[in-house]
Amino acid sequence: MSQPGIPASGGAPASLQAQNGAALASGSPYTNGPVQNALLSSQESVSQGYNFQLPGSYPHPIPAKTLNPVSGQSNYGGSQGSGQTLNRPPVASNPVTPSLHSGPAPRMPLPASQNPATTPMPSSSFLPEANLPPPLNWQYNYPSTASQTNHCPRASSQPTVSGNTSLTTNHQYVSSGYPSLQNSFIKSGPSVPPLVNPPLPTTFQPGAPHGPPPAGGPPPVRALTPLTSSYRDVPQPLFNSAVNQEGITSNTNNGSMVVHSSYDEIEGGGLLATPQLTNKNPKMSRSVGYSYPSLPPGYQNTTPPGATGVPPSSLNYPSGPQAFTQTPLGANHLTTSMSGLSLQPEGLRVVNLLQERNMLPSTPLKPPVPNLHEDIQKLNCNPELFRCTLTSIPQTQALLNKAKLPLGLLLHPFKDLVQLPVVTSSTIVRCRSCRTYINPFVSFLDQRRWKCNLCYRVNDVPEEFLYNPLTRVYGEPHRRPEVQNATIEFMAPSEYMLRPPQPPVYLFVFDVSHNAVETGYLNSVCQSLLDNLDLLPGNTRTKIGFITFDSTIHFYGLQESLSQPQMLIVSDIEDVFIPMPENLLVNLNESKELVQDLLKTLPQMFTKTLETQSALGPALQAAFKLMSPTGGRMSVFQTQLPTLGVGALKPREEPNHRSSAKDIHMTPSTDFYKKLALDCSGQQVAVDLFLLSGQYSDLASLGCISRYSAGSVYYYPSYHHQHNPVQVQKLQKELQRYLTRKIGFEAVMRIRCTKGLSIHTFHGNFFVRSTDLLSLPNVNPDAGYAVQMSVEESLTDTQLVSFQSALLYTSSKGERRIRVHTLCLPVVSTLNDVFLGADVQAISGLLANMAVDRSMTASLSDARDALVNAVIDSLSAYRSSVLSNQQPGLMVPFSLRLFPLFVLALLKQKSFQTGTNARLDERIFAMCQVKNQPLVYLMLTTHPSLYRVDNLSDEGALNISDRTIPQPPILQLSVEKLSRDGAFLMDAGSVLMLWVGKNCTQNFLSQVLGVQNYASIPQPMTDLPELDTPESARIIAFISWLREQRPFFPILYVIRDESPMKANFLQNMIEDRTESALSYYEFLLHIQQQVNK
């Protein structure tokens, strides 16, 4: 964003500061971005169906609860920063800098009262209904009219206006990164063992072909001549600005280079980009891709477009070489209905959930495959990286409203990949209108022209792009890696950078108060740092520093010329200053011995301290001042509630009411940590918080420092090196991953979509720097994001839509890189097709994000009611609009057969459960995880996997690196699946629980647990002995394999029948009734009663 006192690109300082959370002069409340959307829910009247009641039905169904609109607005973005929408304010010319560009102003959305498309929403559902005031509820489709932060305004996919914006690519490794603990996406078929040393991704260098070049060699590189007109004014370069970097430099018509001064301009294609001249003929063929084999007769149901895809008379382009022929992918390559595909029969089934019980598959649930031609689908993005809640996009907003399902994307953009194509080229080909990166779903009209699949502009193919470095053939632009891979990484040239890449900087901030010393965490952390010091991502420029604090702040001089570390104490916490800053952040290679000495002595330096106060706020201020010039990663370790100086907090939790549905302490008690996080984001500093506390520490307030700076939160309740050794093991394992995993610095991310679609709300840890540009001072491979979308214009003229995320970052090696993911989905016109393409896991994940926001802006009970109403609304819509005959029971499409189960699991998840057995910090941490975890981990935490493991066999096992990994079937989460003569393993994501029945076989007890009888099982038991038996080898291999697939370390608890941990085990039996929640069958009866009203 802009520096203090400097207006951001294209806007007045006041409005910008308001958006980013700075208090306005008028005294308006401090807010951080778009205001929470109203939960779009149209309570469409549902026809009175046959109210079928089964014997034994739940006698007192829950009445449907209508939420009251919530007045006012939250000053904060919620626990994770509410997913918010942001309307674009009119863009004012910069009064200081003369406008360098001109162009038509973007179309602004009308106020809710004037915009016929924006319908007010009732508070307890997702769908539009007339004559109701817009409450503070979830909203699928439309942005709200105010603004808050951590979730962004809508990013319209209108042909965005030039703004010549190419991502400034932060350079990342040419390799795909460090070996990952997680398995990469593997297509169906035999499992592929993970590589111990993943191969480096291929680097394509047009200037250095793999073999002898074709006759005559490749042509000389011709400089691109992008347009320079842009709607927004360009201020002077802001070299420390994080937001101003998603962009490309452009050549003016006379060939001179103009370096843009903001990320938004470099990356380009944002809301304020300028539309280019495009063909306005609505009948113009919007073909996608390049020549594909002809389809079977069943697919050829429409007339294909013309050979060129664009009427020559309407576009006066030179014909260019005519030898290149390409049949564009037209309507004959896409069926108009799901019935055209040879889907599995169950895809079209209607399921009565009250009669069919075993709907949970015995293998991990796979995402639905979009209804696309196989030649398009094989190029599509891996769903682990990029997936949509609806794999068939509704043609209109009205159709989406009628389906009453959320439309959104879930992303894991920086995931560790075994193979990642990396392109090194002086020319990065992008659409000159919307700045989309060329991708597999564009159309080549001929050898010299390609049509953008997002805004449909026809662009010229640069000369260099005609040469294919893989085949060493000239004249094959459609075979280049950029159009053969939906996920690709570009090495960005220097003109993509606003300032030279900064060195990797790692600053560690340790709490050394008496409480911290008692936990013994310093021993574990310092030892982990010593063990992994050489594995920190970076190069010869890597810098490191340390700060400790109690009631004072301690700095450590580590300059190479010193014989031992020098401790500098600052006792004035009211006005913190940095003593000898040049000695505090030092080159790791040059001062490694001093760093090692400090890490060895630090745990003993404060063993006799009696200081109980904690000045966390002043310590964070000092750390921020130290890191501001370069940016980097700040790792903060805290063990108690801050009690001294700025940011001091007071206990707010009442034990007897700590988890009630009307909890009022889920929002921050101060805006200090949020304001500081915004300052950190502006200087490219991300803050990761490690909270190791058995007492209430107000994570709702402390978590803001990570949420808005794109950091992460780690929570270790009741950490103690002697009393809770299993937490020590967990901290060490997770620190090893944290310290050695890949990292990107100075990152920004933008998501684009096809014209007609609009992105209006973002979820995750970041800060929205401009209307659709996410600022990520650090990006890590374990973070996930979500966005909500609406259909802004009818999609009747297109059969395919595309989504593209572009992540610009600097690698730890100092390379600027752009990682691009592109997803292509079909457009459908019938409600049945929308339901058939529903992705129930993605829908559940997006609803969980929305429910966290609702908890913050309204209340926990409102969030729970909205989750239930999401199921009622969608199944009511299916019953009334799709089913031809009203049958008794609870009829659902096969794609949504698990929707009620997953929503019930969310209601019983720690984030949203009622009762008083969850501490407030634990609930807040669970909500942090919902907002920051990739979908695969979120679903595992929400709906654990249950396996029977006392009879493991090699049948159907995976063979990975000489290991045999058993694959037992997944069981339903109900006690009726348990038996006292067996042993059952529950994988709940962050914890593994092995329940051993009282009558378990002697063979399992002796061959796996190493005990002679049931009573001999030690309590607590948190590890399995490695015995020389086949049974022991199988279960240890299986548990190790489960742990390897995630970036966090799940603790294993072996539970006897009378163990206190048994209650935790049974709490995760989602289908059974608990003291405060319905059983699955009772929940289905409640849903049925509401649907049949």
Curated annotation (Swiss-Prot):
This is Protein transport protein Sec24A. Zn(2+) binds at residues 431, 434, 452, 455. COPII is composed of at least five proteins: the Sec23/24 complex, the Sec13/31 complex and Sar1. Interacts with TMED2. Interacts (as part of the Sec23/24 complex) with SEC22B; recruits SEC22B into COPII-coated vesicles for its transport from the endoplasmic reticulum to the Golgi. Interacts with STING1; promoting STING1 translocation to COPII vesicles in a STEEP1-dependent manner. Interacts with TMEM39A. Interacts with SACM1L; this interaction is reduced in the absence of TMEM39A. Disulfide bonds: none annotated. Residues 191-201, 209-221 have a biased composition (Pro residues). Gelsolin-like repeats lie at residues 966-1038. Gene3D superfamilies: beta-sandwich domain of Sec23/24, Sec23/Sec24 helical domain, Severin, von Willebrand factor, type A domain, Zn-finger domain of Sec23/24. Residues 431-455 are annotated as: Zinc finger-like. Residues 1-29, 60-168, 189-226, 294-328 are annotated as: Disordered. Keywords: Cytoplasm, Cytoplasmic vesicle, Endoplasmic reticulum, ER-Golgi transport, Membrane, Metal-binding, Protein transport, Transport, Zinc. Residues 112-126, 138-168, 299-328 have a biased composition (Polar residues). Its main location: membrane.
